[in-house]
Amino acid sequence: MSKNKLSKGQQRRVQANHQRRLRTDRKPELDDSQLGDAQEGIVISRFGQHADVEAVDGTQHRCNIRRTIKSLVTGDRVVWRPGLQAQEGVRVKGIVEAVHERTSVLTRPDLYDGVKPIAANIDQIVIVSAILPELSLNIIDRYLVACETLEVEPLIVLNKIDLLDADGRKFVDGMMDIYRRIGYDVLEVSSQTREGMEAFENALTGRISIFAGQSGVGKSSLLNALLPPTDNEILVNTVSGNSGLGQHTTTAARLYHFQHGGDVIDSPGVREFGLWHLAPEQITQGFVEFRDYLGHCKFRDCSHTNDPGCALREAVEQGKIAEERFDNYHRILESMEQAKPRKTSDSDEK
C-alpha cells in the first residue's frame, strides 16, 4: 500500500468530518476559540492556500482552506467560519470548512493534470464574437463544442453591430440564423450604442456567467458596461492568434456582480478552451444537429468525409445541416492533432 493512500476507515472519517462541517448550525469547537460560527458563503477568488469568501451580507473575508478540501475554485458554495478579533488587535483569517456539491464545474485541459477545474456552478458561457477583427464561425463552433462537452449552456453574443450597414446587417443575420435554427440563443448588441443591451442584461440576470471569445471582440467593453464603476477594470488576457482560444496566464479567476443582477466569473482559464484532449467522437457529439444522424451511416467506421452512404453528408446535401458547420467540424478535427501539446522530455531539452 502506498504511504499516501488512505485506508477505507480513514476515508470514512474524512467524509464524516466533511459532512459535519457542512452543518452551519453547529457551535465552534473549544480549540477553535478564534473562529466564529459556521455560515454559508461563496468563493469570490482563490489564491493558493487562501480564498476570498463573500458572506450572505455581502462582506468579503480572506480565509484559509482546510487541508481535507481537495478542490476549491471560484464560484464554489461553501461553509466557512470568520476569524475573530485577536487580543493584539489583528483579525484572524477565517477558514473554509466544507464545499457544497457543485451544479456544474468548468474545466480546461492541462498537459500534466489531465483536466483542471477553474470555476464552479456556472450557468452559462457567453460566447462573444464581433464583425471586427473578423466574424469567425469556426471560433464560435469551437466554443460550442466545448460548451456541449462541459454541459454548460451557451449564449452567443455578436458585438459591434453598430459598425454594420444595411447589407452587412442582412449578411450577419443570415450567419446567426444558422445557430438560431439549431436551438442556440443569439443576441446582436453594441456596447457603444447600447442596442440589444437590455435583452443581454435580462439573459444574464439571476445567473453566473463566464465570457469567452477572441481578442478584440469587445469582451472588456461589454463587461465594463454591465459592471458597477467600482468593478469595471476587468483584466483581458492575451489571446492566441493561432487558435483564438487563448494562452495560459496566472491571473486568478474572480467573481463580480452585475449592476442589474447576476454574476460573472472573469477567468483567464476560459481562454484555454483547447479541444486537443477530446476524442473525435466527442467533437462529433458536440455538433448538436449531427446527433439525429449518427449511427445511420452505411459503414460503422464512417469518417463523415467522402465515405459512401454517409448520413451526415446526405443531410448537408439536403440542406438539413448547414454546410458552414459541417466544414468547421472537419477543420476542428484536422487541427486537433496539430494543436495537441507535447510534454517536453529530457532529450528535447539537451
UniProtKB/Swiss-Prot annotation:
Free-text remark on how the cofactor is bound: Binds 1 zinc ion per subunit.
CDD domains: YjeQ_EngC
UniProt xrefs under InterPro entries: G_CP_dom, NA-bd_OB-fold, P-loop_NTPase, Ribosome_biogen_GTPase_RsgA, RsgA_GTPase_dom
EC number(s) reported in the record: 3.6.1.-
Keyword list, A-Z: Cytoplasm, GTP-binding, Hydrolase, Metal-binding, Nucleotide-binding, Ribosome biogenesis, RNA-binding, rRNA-binding, Zinc
Cell compartments where the protein resides: Cytoplasm
Binding annotation for GTP: N159, K160, I161, D162, G213, Q214, S215, G216, V217, G218, K219, S220, S221
Example of a GO biological process term: ribosomal small subunit biogenesis
Keyword rRNA-binding: yes
A GO cellular component entry from the record: cytoplasm
Top-level taxon of origin: Bacteria
Ranges for region Disordered: 1-35
Polar residues bias spans: 1-17
Binding, Zn(2+): C297, C302, H304, C310
Domain CP-type G: 103-273
Single GO term (MF): metal ion binding
Entry-linked Pfam families: RsgA_GTPase
Names of the cofactor(s): Zn(2+)
Subunit structure: Monomer. Associates with 30S ribosomal subunit, binds 16S rRNA.
Similarity field: Belongs to the TRAFAC class YlqF/YawG GTPase family. RsgA subfamily.
Chain's role: One of several proteins that assist in the late maturation steps of the functional core of the 30S ribosomal subunit. Helps release RbfA from mature subunits. May play a role in the assembly of ribosomal proteins into the subunit. Circularly permuted GTPase that catalyzes slow GTP hydrolysis, GTPase activity is stimulated by the 30S ribosomal subunit.
Listed name of the protein: Small ribosomal subunit biogenesis GTPase RsgA
Species: Yersinia pestis
UniProt lineage: Bacteria, Pseudomonadati, Pseudomonadota, Gammaproteobacteria, Enterobacterales
